[in-house]
Amino acid sequence: MASSSGPVLLDLYADWCISCKVMERFVFPEPEVARQLARFTLLRADVTANDAQDQALLKQFGLFGPPSLVFFSEDGREIDEFRVQGEVSADRLEAHLAQVLAL
């Protein structure tokens, strides 16, 4: 991963994932969450097909499936202690993003 001008957020999602849809419709658009998300370089990985390539990506990060959020520092190192797996509330994600941004 090339250097970025800020932290990177990799959002792994799937069209069949109900929790992904909840987060996309109700969590990410919340004003404070959206404000904090704007400070990240956002990458989205669509694992809808659940094919060999998708499985390899999930395996690479040790994830069981979407929704999953993986954070990276500006220099491309994963900040693995801040991973999010599964559906989270806007309040929880807002606090989580603030912690990552404070690093």
Regions found by a protein language model. Name each.
Residues S3-C17:
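Short active-site neighborhood of thiol/selenol oxidoreductases, capturing the structured segment around
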Residues V27-P29, F64-L103:
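Non-catalytic, surface beta->alpha helical segment in thiol-disulfide oxidoreductase systems
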Residues L9-L10, L42, L69:
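Hydrophobic beta-strand anchors of alpha/beta hydrolase catalytic cores
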Residues S3, R35-L37, G62-L63:
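Extracellular/periplasmic catalytic domains that process cell-envelope and extracellular macromolecules
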Residues S19-A38:
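Typically the conserved alpha-helix immediately C-terminal to a functionally engaged Cys/Sec
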